[in-house]
A protein has these predicted regions:
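Conserved N-terminal entry element of GNAT/NAT acetyltransferase domains
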Residues: 1-14, 153-154
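A short helix-loop-beta-strand connector motif used in the catalytic cores of GNAT acetyltransferases and
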Residues: 44-56, 84, 140
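A conserved beta-turn-beta hairpin within the catalytic core of GNAT-like acetyltransferases
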Residues: 74-85, 95, 142
Length: 154
C-alpha cells in the first residue's frame, strides 16, 4: 500500500464527509446534516486559514483517514501557540495499518514547524480503542475534559 499524508482538497470533501460520518454516526446519532453549501463554506474557511491544517491519508488513491490540526496563539506560555486536534478518524476497513500513526507524525511535524509548545486532543470516553492507540504513540492523559453545548438551556 502506498500511503501519502497531504492537505485535503475540495475534491476530497465527499470522501471526508463519509469518513467523518463513521465517527459521527456512532458518537453523535442526533446530529443533523448542515447541508452542502454550509459544508463547502466551512471547508473553504479552513483551507484559507494558515493556522488550520485539514489533512488526509491517501492510500493508493483512496482517502482512508483524516485529522484536523488548529494552531492556537496564546498570551501565556511565552506567547507560544498550542495545537488542537479534532476529527481524527481512519476508515474502519483500514485500521491497524499505520495510517493513524502517519497522520499524527505529520501533525507533530506541522506543530513543531509552528512552534507549538504542546498538542492536545479530546476523545470520547467510550472510544477505548482510540485511547489505547494514542497511548501507544506516547500521548499522555493529563487533564479532565468538560464540554457544554453553548445553546443548551441551563
Amino acid at each position: 500500500m502506498k500511503l501519502a499524508v497531504r492537505a485535503a482538497t475540495e475534491a476530497d470533501l465527499p470522501r471526508l464527509l463519509e469518513l467523518l460520518g463513521q465517527m459521527d454516526d456512532s458518537m453523535y446519532p442526533t446530529r443533523r446534516d448542515a447541508g452542502e453549501a454550509a459544508r463547502l463554506s466551512v471547508f473553504r474557511q479552513i483551507a484559507a486559514d494558515p493556522r488550520q491544517h485539514l489533512l488526509v491519508a491517501d492510500a493508493d488513491g483512496r482517502i482512508v483517514g483524516t485529522v484536523h490540526l488548529m494552531v492556537i496563539p496564546h498570551l501565556s506560555q511565552s506567547c507560544k501557540p498550542s495545537g488542537l486536534l479534532e476529527s481524527m478518524v481512519v476508515d474502519e476497513a483500514y485500521r491497524r495499518r499505520g495510517i493513524g500513526a502517519a497522520l499524527l507524525r505529520e501533525v507533530q511535524r506541522l506543530a513543531r514547524e509552528a512552534g507549538c509548545y504542546k498538542l492536545a486532543l479530546s476523545s470520547n470516553l467510550a472510544r477505548y480503542g482510540a485511547h489505547r492507540f494514542y497511548s501507544r504513540l506516547g500521548w499522555k492523559r493529563t487533564h479532565y475534559g468538560f464540554s457544554l453545548e453553548p445553546h443548551a438551556a441551563r
